[in-house]
């Protein structure tokens, strides 16, 4: 009686210091993919225009599906097994042919990736574009994927020209650009290796897809040199454009007050920067050397796929 209760030690020592705030970085919002569907639509419109210009009924009585398609009907199977136009029409509209490129028509290095040899050729490429391109655009945005598509297509066209010793091969198609997207997927996996969970599974699956697609290029009348050139261009460009922040990085604008900045992680790892600048140097050197060889009318004599085109 008359005794005061003991003072709790926490009152004497004051309130405990506030715990370091714990938070999760905001989940990135995926991009809305509109460029890939636009490219797909452009390819279909270009093919329809090609068939209209081709006008098979004006030159042949054996046009395929004339009753249904009329002027847009296909050349006879003996001329084009892919259900498409004639070679002169493709040449007229911008197909890649080294002889014409050397005569000053450099625009064919780009225009050829929007043309296709036939409806079957078009559908195969567009299905691949939807499967590969949509996911990449949702993750990395239209600017980087658009640059990848065009530059890879240009790289494929350049290698195709350089491996054509006769200068008379006519080449069309978006395959070089599509292989560039595959190459970029591989380099993206390598440079962002630390953020993947099932690393080996993802790598082996991607390599299997790439090998299967490259093996198709050894079939007759397939320009595998364009596939190879596009793949290389996309592979090196992927190191430049498709870097992801390392796990645990948070943009400074999302960091709450009171957070210990000593624990803040850098956006990219050192090896990512090394890959980026090395790949950019290789890419620029390759394009400059290739274009210089083309202007000087040189050919690449030691490519393993030259005889399969």
UniProtKB/Swiss-Prot annotation:
Q: What is its main location?
A: membrane
EC id? 3.4.21.105
* SUPFAM superfamilies per UniProt: Rhomboid-like
- Indicate yes or no for the key word Protease: yes
Q: Which UniProt keywords apply?
A: Hydrolase, Membrane, Protease, Serine protease, Transmembrane, Transmembrane helix
Spans traversing the lipid bilayer? 27-47, 113-133, 140-160, 170-190, 200-220, 222-242, 274-294
| Residue ranges of coiled coil | none
> Which Gene3D superfamilies does the UniProt entry name for this protein?
Rhomboid-like (1.20.1540.10)
**Which BP terms from GO are recorded?**
proteolysis
Q: How does it sit in the membrane?
A: Multi-pass membrane protein
Leader sequence residues: none
Gene Ontology molecular function terms on file: serine-type endopeptidase activity
Q: What catalytic reaction does the record list?
A: Cleaves type-1 transmembrane domains using a catalytic dyad composed of serine and histidine that are contributed by different transmembrane domains
Positions annotated as active site in the UniProt record: 175 (nucleophile), 227 (charge relay system)
Compartments, record wording: Membrane
CC per GO annotation: membrane
Q: Which family does it belong to?
A: Belongs to the peptidase S54 family.
Question: What is this protein's function?
Answer: Probable rhomboid-type serine protease that catalyzes intramembrane proteolysis. May function in reproductive organs maturation.
Q: What is this protein called?
A: RHOMBOID-like protein 5
The source organism is Arabidopsis thaliana
